């Protein structure tokens, strides 16, 4: 099966055929850098990071551009509130964004252009639109004339007349059509500005993405991405500006991620119902957050709640525990390396594991080829882990075959890990990290737990089972579960 992607432009899943064989040009709208990023922003960026990684894993050469919107009303407002220059705000939040993305394990895009570093390209594009009759000057502003661009609203499939009728916003009478949007904004006194043929001003939001995407990727490119909320007006306006200027199709595939919701409402700054990436990473491991964000298909809504993150943590822990068990099996009886597994000699459970592990790369590819279905891909990993647990718990001895099977599972999960950017940690240390995090929320210290475990071992040795049970129950009351084995006693948080 070849890769198929859901294209918002056609409303269908289509075969993905790059314009130039072997190469993919992809632009994703970045953040407006006026505040800390929330989990909705994390989702948009993680989703396209995985799409980027998957395309690369298919052997495609991907030119991935993600911008920073570093001039905007929201940035100016915050700068005024804090009494600093606009670029003190944008620079601060670019640094914060970069730090958040690095924590979430994102690969760097090929280019990360900033709007303010592309003013000449923006002015040239606006001038071209005026020269071609698609834009007009209105005082110190320049507007795009939507009626001149016939396919306007082809992405969101809205109707201009209906929208006009429905528009209750106060409309500037000087506009030729109420839906005309601004390409260049005249600077108000005290606002940052750049010189232009229309006076001192700054670019509108939509034009920057047309100018930067076409500069880095050409007039027509393969993929344009962003959150669903950008379909209208942002992407619709990008299409209008770019296609009106170039006379060519702008983008072949439009991909949009679904929202992170809280109580069925979009997480957003304006609603105030948001959690920043930093806040969440204070509490949860970054791999847990990434795991959570990829646990749903990228177009589906994703409900954010403490409970859902805790469930993601438990799910990830289950997989890592299996990876630790695999490592322990390999340590106790290393696979001699490269040995063939004789399938006919396997018992029923081993046979199932052998089959599921062997077919994992193919099933992963099928899931991802179906519009990047990371949820299904993760389901395949859980399925495999169930088989691993069964085989390891039923195995009477650590045989060479068992080690060879474990080595195969480890290698095949490893291949997927690189594309999803999860399961990449050293398993034992990840489990320790999770345990430490949970322990930090307990009302008992790790030292105290370990002291009690030592005391309990001594009590058991002295056959003082009353004291030993007392300690176990006391710890259980603190949500600590003890597990006795031949190697000693280990503990985990319930
Ligand atoms: N709740 C969300 N779920 C998924 N993606 C989101 C969410 N909120 C924003 N995004 C996406 O993040 C990217 C950056 O958005 P942008 O900087 O324009 O956000 P914003 O409009 O400032 O955020 P907010 O919506 O909170 O005001 C866009 O692709 C946007 O669609
Ligand atoms: Zn954009």
Swiss-Prot record:
Co-factor binding details: Binds 1 zinc ion per subunit.
Q: What cofactor(s) does the depicted protein rely on?
A: Zn(2+)
Its subcellular locations are: Cytoplasm
InterPro entries hit by this protein: Cys-tRNA-ligase, Cys-tRNA-synt_Ia_DALR, Cys-tRNA/MSH_ligase, Rossmann-like_a/b/a_fold, tRNA-synt_1_cat_dom, tRNAsynth_Ia_anticodon-bd
Key words of the record? Aminoacyl-tRNA synthetase, ATP-binding, Cytoplasm, Ligase, Metal-binding, Nucleotide-binding, Protein biosynthesis, Zinc
**What is the reaction catalyzed?**
tRNA(Cys) + L-cysteine + ATP = L-cysteinyl-tRNA(Cys) + AMP + diphosphate
Q: Which residues bind Zn(2+)?
A: 29, 209, 234, 238
Indicate the enzyme's highest-level EC class: ligase
Positions annotated to bind ATP:
269
Q: Where is this motif: 'KMSKS' region?
A: 266-270
Q: Which CDD domains match?
A: Anticodon_Ia_Cys, CysRS_core
Checking NCBIfam families in the record gives: cysS
Q: PANTHER family given for it?
A: CYSTEINE--TRNA LIGASE, CYTOPLASMIC (PTHR10890:SF3), CYSTEINYL-TRNA SYNTHETASE (PTHR10890)
What is this protein's name?
Cysteine--tRNA ligase
Origin organism is: Geotalea uraniireducens (strain Rf4) (Geobacter uraniireducens)
What taxonomic classification does the UniProt entry list for its organism? Bacteria, Pseudomonadati, Thermodesulfobacteriota, Desulfuromonadia, Geobacterales
């Amino acid at each position: 099966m070849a890769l198929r992607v859901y294209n918002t432009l056609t409303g269908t899943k289509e075969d993905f055929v790059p314009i130039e064989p072997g190469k993919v040009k992809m632009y994703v709208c970045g953040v407006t850098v006026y505040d800390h990023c929330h989990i909705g922003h994390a989702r948009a960026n993680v989703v396209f990071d995985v799409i980027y990684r998957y395309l690369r894993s298919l052997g495609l050469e991907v030119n991935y551009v993600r911008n920073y919107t570093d001039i905007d009303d929201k940035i100016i407002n915050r700068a005024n509130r804090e009494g600093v220059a606009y670029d003190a705000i944008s620079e601060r939040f670019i640094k914060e964004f970069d730090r958040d993305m690095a924590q979430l394990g994102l690969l760097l895009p090929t280019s990360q252009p900033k709007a303010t570093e592309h003013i000449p390209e923006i002015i040239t594009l606006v001038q071209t639109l005026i020269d071609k009759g698609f834009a007009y000057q209105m005082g110190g502003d320049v507007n795009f004339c939507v009626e001149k661009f016939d396919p306007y609203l082809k992405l969101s499939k809205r109707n201009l007349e209906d929208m006009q009728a429905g528009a209750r916003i106060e409309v500037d009478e000087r506009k030729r059509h109420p839906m005309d949007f601004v390409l260049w904004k005249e600077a108000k006194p005290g606002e940052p500005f750049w010189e232009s043929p229309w006076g001192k001003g700054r670019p509108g939001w939509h034009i920057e993405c047309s100018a930067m995407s076409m500069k880095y990727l050409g007039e027509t490119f393969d993929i344009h991405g962003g959150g669903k909320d950008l379909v209208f007006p942002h992407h619709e306006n990008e299409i209008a500006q770019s296609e009106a200027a170039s006379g060519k199709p702008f983008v072949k595939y439009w991909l949009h991620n679904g929202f992170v919701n809280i109580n069925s409402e979009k997480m957003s700054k304006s609603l105030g119902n948001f959690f920043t990436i930093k806040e969440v990473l204070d509490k949860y491991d970054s791999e847990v957050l990434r795991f959570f964000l990829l646990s749903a298909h990228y177009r589906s809504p994703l409900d954010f709640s403490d409970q859902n993150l805790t469930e993601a943590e438990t799910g990830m822990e289950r997989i890592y525990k299996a990876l630790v068990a695999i490592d322990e099996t390999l340590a106790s009886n290393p696979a001699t390396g490269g040995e063939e597994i004789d399938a006919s000699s396997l018992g029923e459970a081993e046979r199932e594991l052998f089959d599921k592990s062997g077919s994992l790369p193919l099933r992963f590819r099928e899931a991802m080829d179906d519009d990047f279905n990371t949820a299904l891909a993760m389901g395949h990993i859980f399925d495999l882990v169930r088989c691993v647990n069964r085989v390891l718990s039923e195995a009477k001895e650590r045989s060479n075959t068992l080690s060879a099977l474990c080595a195969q599972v480890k290698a095949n999960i490893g291949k997927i890990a690189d594309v999803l950017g999860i399961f990449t940690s050293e398993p034992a240390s990840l489990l320790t990290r999770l345990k430490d995090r949970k322990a930090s929320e307990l009302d008992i210290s790790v030292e105290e737990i370990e002291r009690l475990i030592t005391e309990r071992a001594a009590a058991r040795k002295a056959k003082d089972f009353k004291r030993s049970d007392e300690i176990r129950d006391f710890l259980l009351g603190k949500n600590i579960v003890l597990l006795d084995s031949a190697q000693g006693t280990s503990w985990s948080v319930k």
